[in-house]
Every structure is written in structure tokens, then in C-alpha cells.
Amino acid sequence: YYTGGCVAGAKALPIDGAEWQAMRLSRNRYWGTPKLVETIEQLAREGRALDGWPGLLVGDLGQPRGGPTPSDHISHQSGLDVDIWFDPMPDRRLSEEERETISATSLLVPGTNYELDMDKWPEGLDRVLKRAAGYPQVQRILVNPGVKKLLCDRAGDDRAWLSKIRPWYKHDDHFHMRLRCPKGGKTCRSQNPPPAGDGCGVGLDYWFSEVPWK
């Protein structure tokens, strides 16, 4: 399962591609199933070619053999999860030092849980998230509730993809993309699919209510 397991035959995401750069290299968390690596590369290529997105800054995948990480994650254990920064890739190669020290940009107004600062919203982010959600191998994408609400408000009539965009704590500086278990993976247990519908109604309202987050 995503929060308890390991991975055999993991593949390393190349730390540099024409449309992506891996971050926090010292953690050695750029390993995943071949399908996860393939999907990241596909999103990076198509995001640039079709959505005007300069490229991906890729955060943590998992460790070479999966399993629990020393910090930051409960999931990312089975080679099916990746964090991708909301920041677009710059038009130059970042140094090793920059990849360790630069922080992902929060899209929130400081001191708030879900209020977006639209001056920080990158052009094309909507399209990249929609593209990722449209991949059949993607099980769900976790984002801050404020990001989910904005996508709901902007989506128009084409809304089926929104069901995979799930509001979750934090996730204000990156999105968490999770793949389904690979076909034939008898030892892999997938998460239940997202509820039917676009997820923009009562389920989203909870995050903006006075009820404390659980």
C-alpha cells in the first residue's frame, strides 16, 4: 500500500531532462516504479509542448527500495507517489546547491490555510493539473483546498477530471500525484477510487467551514 510497503525493480528518474529537473538530490528519493518515472517524463514533455508549462521541478518520489522515509512522508513507500512543485522550471539548469536550498513557493496568503495569493499563481498550472488528472494511470492528485476550489471555479463544462483532484492538508507549494497499482501487481493494493462527481460540492465545503480540520 502507499503508506506501508516497498518496491522491487525501482527505476531512477534522471535528475535532468529537457523538460524537468529533480530537486533535493541528497535525499536519494528520485526512485519509483518504471510507470511512475514514465508518467513524470510524459507530463513534463506534454506540459511544455501542449500547455505552455516551462517544465517540472520534481520533488520526492521514493527511496531505491521504497519503504518509510526518515522525514516528511507517510506515503511514498511503494514507488507510486511523486511530489511536483507548483513552481515552473526556470530556463537554466539549477546547481546542486540551489536544488538543496531553494524552497517551493507557497501559493497561499501568509498565515492562511487556503486563501490563494493570485499574484503567485503560475500561468499554465491549471492546464498541467488537468493533463495529469486525465492520465488513466493516475489514481488521484492531492492539492491544497484553495487550489481545488480555484480549479472548480475555472473548469467550465469539462469537469470529469476534477474528481481526481483531491483537497488535502498543506500541499500549498506542490501537488502530490499518485498512480494506480500496476497491472498484474498482485502484492499492491490500490486506494479506493475518488467519489463520483467533480468533488466541488459538500465535500469541498468542509474545508472552508468552521469545523476544525481532522
Can you annotate each of these PLM segments?
Residues L56-G62, V82-F86, V143, F175-L179, ...:
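Long, contiguous hydrophobic alpha-helical segments, chiefly transmembrane helices and signal peptides
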Residues L94-K214:
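Catalytic cores and adjacent binding grooves of peptidoglycan-active enzymes
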Residues Q63-D117:
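Acidic/His-rich structured neighborhood in mature extracellular/periplasmic domains
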Residues T39-S71, L142-K164:
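Extended, low-complexity, intrinsically disordered C-terminal regulatory tails
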Residues Y1-V58, K120-R131, Y135:
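Active-site acidic/histidine clusters and adjacent loop/turn architecture
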